[in-house]
């Protein structure tokens, strides 16, 4: 993944292996840059410098403090309802929808810069990953994540819906 969006989910608690994968994916952009520059893999110090200067953007939309915030390069503190509104506006912008009912009040203006950053990152991404879950028992989280994945209109876009507890998905 080259852009990751996490909506109202503490992935570190509900899906620790996914949290590990996100932590490792943050280095992908720097490693790809090193490969394109012809830096051999055994030069780990040079690669680590590129990893630090070219991180994969990780947007975390959360209403409280959680362990997943340590993964974030962009942390958006918002109530659960506001986080859904932010992603709805992002989806509308990506679809270039002119009617935007989610911006009707002045309280939304504090999220405008975040919306622009997120739209830019999702447009530039080749393989964006959108994560949402059932941790907060909000069906709107799942709906807006699915709508955002559709709005990205990218065949490489990925959607991950996480159950409410660690190891709770049994097959």
Model-identified regions with their sequence ranges:
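Cofactor-pocket helix-loop regions in the catalytic cores of large enzyme subunits
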Residues: 1-171
């Amino acid at each position: 993944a080259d852009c990751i969006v996490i909506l109202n989910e503490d992935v570190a608690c509900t899906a620790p292996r996914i949290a590990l994968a996100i932590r490792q994916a943050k280095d992908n952009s720097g490693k790809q840059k090193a490969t394109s520059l012809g830096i051999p893999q055994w030069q780990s110090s040079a690669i680590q410098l590129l990893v630090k200067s070219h991180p994969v953007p990780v947007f975390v939309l959360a209403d409280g403090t959680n362990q997943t915030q340590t993964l974030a390069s962009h942390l958006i503190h918002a109530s659960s309802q506001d986080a859904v509104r932010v992603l709805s506006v992002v989806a509308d912008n990506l679809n270039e929808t002119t009617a935007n009912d989610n911006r009707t009040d002045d309280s939304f203006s504090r999220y405008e810069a975040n919306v622009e950053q997120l739209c830019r990152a999702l447009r530039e991404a080749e393989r964006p990953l959108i994560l949402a879950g059932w941790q907060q028992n909000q069906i709107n989280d799942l709906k807006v994540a699915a709508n955002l994945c559709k709005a990205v209109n990218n065949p490489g876009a990925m959607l991950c819906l996480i159950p409410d507890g660690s190891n709770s998905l049994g097959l």
